Regions:
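Core beta-strand elements of the Rossmann-like FAD/NAD(P) dinucleotide-binding domain
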Residues: 3, 196-205
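Glycine-rich FAD pyrophosphate-binding loop
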Residues: 22-42
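Dinucleotide-binding Rossmann-like beta1-alpha1 core, especially the glycine-rich loop
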Residues: 45-130
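Helix-loop-beta segment of a Rossmann-like dinucleotide-binding subdomain
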Residues: 87-89, 128-165, 187-189, 201, ...
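Flavin (primarily FAD) binding-site architecture
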Residues: 208-222
């Protein structure tokens, strides 16, 4: 069988394209060398946030992220959950306080697009009622809403929905070579990493959704994907420290999140250029990076110095290349690269850049390009309206609590 499209990479972008393409009637093969969402997707801060910090230098990314985060919430209510945040304000910085409130006022319209509440300004007493451990020099706080997500299930359910629409899934299968007819890419050769079997799959279009590995995959065809990979680490604590997140400030001014997530708390992230092997980035977490994050937490909550980290982990962002820009200020915009026009290699597309909150839009745009390259007429995407598996009919938890002797909130947590 010759597939319409073979996709290399089962992170959220690859799985999203597989779902969109399959739902628009294309035959799809999806390859992932590990398990769904095992790379950059799984190493994220696990929020479909609106890109608040990008508002300073990349307003279009904030807009599209906020709009598509609302769609992700709509199609995956069982995977997403509200995280109310506090942004501590410190003594001696009155102008900074006013600037931050003006900044959140500008962000409010984007927050509302994804279902968040308007920000509020709290006194020190009000802030300490919510988080009693705040440092003595905290004179107040600002509030805002973001949304957490189970990233591994999000990637897996996109792949599952693609399969229900007819896609073939190949987890734990590494693409080791591209197949050619002349200069045209015509498929992939893959190796099953569980049993060692090597097999070939032909396709009319091959999509490189390899994330930070995209440059290496494109190089198999003599093509080029220019990225500026960024390393980000997180520290996880073994308990849920509170029900509110905190927006922290690193010693270099970088925004850092302390995020309650299930029974754990996540602290992150850093942002540094990285040109090593993305598969080994977990082995390159340094004591200085961990200390940097812990110091940011201790600035807001002195007791954080006594918290016991459970683990530290890292990932690599596949950010688009920019020269002369600090890693923290790199754009999170995305591009679909057509290597026929860029490198004279027909049959190969690459996905570059992007962020978790706008994966669905990225997949829609990529599928539009695939349809055009295949000579098919345009077909509308339904991925922003069709619920992911398991989200079709959320139960009435209040009514269910009358039958099961548990609080509605507990039942909702079990359902999620």
């Amino acid at each position: 069988m010759v597939f319409d499209v073979a996709i290399i990479g089962g992170g959220i972008n690859g799985a999203g394209v597989a779902r969109d393409a399959a739902l628009r009637g294309l035959s799809v093969a999806l390859f992932e060398r590990e398990d769904w969402g095992a790379g950059t997707t799984g190493a994220s801060t696990r929020m479909v946030h609106g890109g608040m910090r990008y508002l300073l230098y990349d307003v279009p990314t904030t807009r599209t992220s906020s709009e598509d985060a609302a769609r992700v919430r709509r199609i995956a209510p069982h995977l997403t959950f509200r995280i109310p945040f506090l942004w501590p304000l410190y003594a001696g910085r009155p102008l900074f306080h006013e600037a931050m409130e003006a900044f959140l006022s500008a962000y409010d319209p984007y927050a509302r697009r994804k279902g968040g509440l308007r920000h509020a300004r709290l006194t020190a007493e009000q802030a300490r009622r919510i988080e009693p451990g705040l440092a003595p020099d905290v004179t107040g706080a600002l509030t805002l809403d973001e949304w957490g997500v189970d990233v591994h299930r999000l990637a897996a359910l996109n792949a599952l929905d693609a399969r229900e629409a007819g896609a073939r899934l190949f987890p734990h299968c590494e693409v080791v070579e591209l197949l050619f007819s002349g200069r045209t890419v015509r498929g992939v050769r893959a190796r099953d990493r569980l049993d060692g079997r090597v097999f070939e799959v032909e396709a009319r279009i091959v999509v490189n959704a390899g994330g930070p590995w995209a440059g290496r995959i494109a190089a198999m065809a003599g093509a080029r994907v220019q990225l500026r990979p960024g390393k980000g680490i997180h520290v996880t604590f073994e308990r849920r420290i509170g029900n509110h997140g905190l927006i922290l400030e690193g010693v270099d001014g970088r925004t850092i999140f302390l995020v309650p997530h299930g029974a754990e708390t996540i602290l992150g992230t850093t942002d540094d250029d990285f040109y090593g092997d993305p598969a080994r980035v977990d082995y390159e977490v340094t004591r200085d990076e961990i200390a940097y994050l812990l110091e940011a937490a201790a600035r807001a909550i002195p007791q954080a110095r006594t918290w016991r980290p459970l683990r530290a982990w890292a990932g690599v962002r596949n950010t688009l290349f920019e020269w002369g820009v600090h890693a923290d200020a790199l754009s999170r915009r995305h591009e679909v690269l057509d290597h026929e026009t860029r490198d004279g290699v027909p049959g190969l597309l690459s996905l570059a850049g992007g962020k978790l909150a706008s994966y669905r839009l990225f997949a829609e745009e990529a599928t539009d390009v695939i349809l055009e390259k295949l000579g098919h007429p345009p077909r509308p995407s339904i991925t922003g309206e069709r619920p992911l598996p398991g989200a079709e009919a959320p139960p009435d938890f209040v009514r269910l609590a009358r039958e099961i002797p548990l609080p509605p909130a507990t039942l909702e947590r079990i359902w999620r």
